[in-house]
Structures are given as C-alpha cells and as structure tokens.
Design a protein with these regions (language model features):
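Short, Lys/Arg-enriched N-terminal segments with co-localized hydrophobic residues
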Residues: 17-37
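Short proline/glycine- and basic residue-enriched helix-capping loop/turn segments at helix->loop/beta transitions
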Residues: 116
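Glycine-rich hexapeptide-repeat left-handed beta-helix
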Residues: 33, 37-48, 54, 82-90, ...
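N-terminal glycine-rich anion-binding loops that anchor highly charged ligand groups
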Residues: 62-68
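Serine residues within intrinsically disordered or low-complexity segments
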Residues: 2, 13, 19-21
C-alpha cells in the first residue's frame, strides 16, 4: 500500500456489500430443514445472546459469551469462550469465517459497541474499542488493545500487547500505526455497522417468512 492519503479509500476494501437476494432461496430451504447455530454451554457457562441479535446457521458460539443488542455472528464464524469470557457489545458484527478466542484465564476478548469485524479475522485475548473496523484476514493477538474508531487494515498482524491509540490506521506485519484518521474517515465507519444492523433485520424477516411457509411436521 502506498503512503498517499488519496489511495486509502480505493485500496482498502474491508467490508464488501453483498446481495441478500442471491441467497434467499437456499437459506429459506436451510431454515425449513431445521438448521440452527451451534450454541453450546461449556464449564457450566451458557452463551447469553440478546433476542435482537442474529447468529447464522453455521456459526458456533461456545461457553462464557455475551452478545448484545442487534449484533451479529455470521456464517462459519466461531466464538469460543471456553477458558475465559468473551463480550460482544451492541450493534457489533462478526463476519463470515472469523475466529474469536481467549487467553486461558488471563485475557478475555472484548468487542465494544458498533465494531465491524471483517471476514476471516482472528481475535485472540484482545480488546477492540467502540466503533473500530477490523479488516478482512487480519489478526489481533493477546493483550492488544485497539483504540476507539480505529481501522486495522486487511491482512495486518497486531502483535501481543500492542496498544493502538484512538482514530488510528494500523497496517502491516507486524502492524504499525500509519497515521491518524481524518474526521471524514471516522464518520464513514458508522456506515459499516449500520449496514449490518440492517442485514440482521432482513435475515430475521427472511427466517420468519420461511418458518411461516414451512409445512407443519406430522
């Protein structure tokens, strides 16, 4: 990636829009077959998922996990709170293929409100503050903390114990703070989580329609 500010929006595509209509038929059939997410207790701890949140059919949520209002965990994602706790705040989205785990008894994983976590991210025993965007394929390691309204670029590796100031653009392997975000870029972060809150509502409506249309079991 070049260092020029003008290249930032074009070069970093963290969250790609998708068409819900392309998946409607297949997903409706999947729901009618009774598919549900794997939501599993561990060590006496049961995941606590707000009724307005959405967990996709092929996602896995295990153990001491809390998921807040209008948040979402998408297809193939794994949220594993087995050896410590995980908290996902309100209006936060964990996209397809992401893995969230913890450090055994030392570092939980916390995603504050309005965080967007892109596809195939690994978050391990770290803390991501409010309004951040964690780009596709990136890794954030134990005891790292990402300051509010920051962007972790796609493919970045945030090393253990790294502290990222608020409103930072972080990129590279190992990740470094490239620069501070502009007011315009910070304002643009809202659109990512707002999109996913909308997707939650659409998917819930699709599932309700599919359930209503399904024939009653004998």
């Amino acid at each position: 990636m070049s260092g020029g500010r003008e290249a930032f929006p074009a070069r970093l595509s963290f969250v790609l829009p998708f068409s819900l209509s392309r998946e409607r038929i297949g997903r409706a059939r999947f729901r009618r077959r009774g598919a549900t997410p794997m939501i599993k207790s561990f060590g006496g701890k049961q995941p606590q998922i707000h009724p307005t949140a959405y967990v996709a059919e092929t996602a896995t949520v295990i153990g001491d996990v809390t998921i807040g209002r209008e948040s979402s965990v998408w297809f193939g994602a794994v949220v594993r709170g087995d050896v410590f706790w995980i908290k996902i705040g309100d209006r936060t989205n964990v996209q397809d293929g992401t893995v969230i785990h913890v450090s055994n008894g030392t570092h939980p994983t916390v995603l504050e409100d309005e965080v967007t976590v892109g596809h195939n991210v690994t978050l391990h025993g770290c803390h991501v503050e409010r309004g951040c965007l964690v780009g596709m394929g990136s890794i954030v390691m134990d005891a790292a903390r990402i300051g509010a309204q920051s962007i972790v670029a796609a493919g970045a590796l945030v090393s253990p114990g790294t502290i990222v100031p608020p409103r930072s653009l972080v990129l590279g392997v190992p990740a470094r703070v490239k620069r501070q975000l502009t007011d315009e870029e910070v304002a643009g972060l809202e659109q990512f989580w707002k999109n996913y809150v909308g997707y939650v509502q659409q998917y819930k409506a699709e599932d309700a329609a599919a359930a209503a249309a399904a024939p009653a079991s004998s």
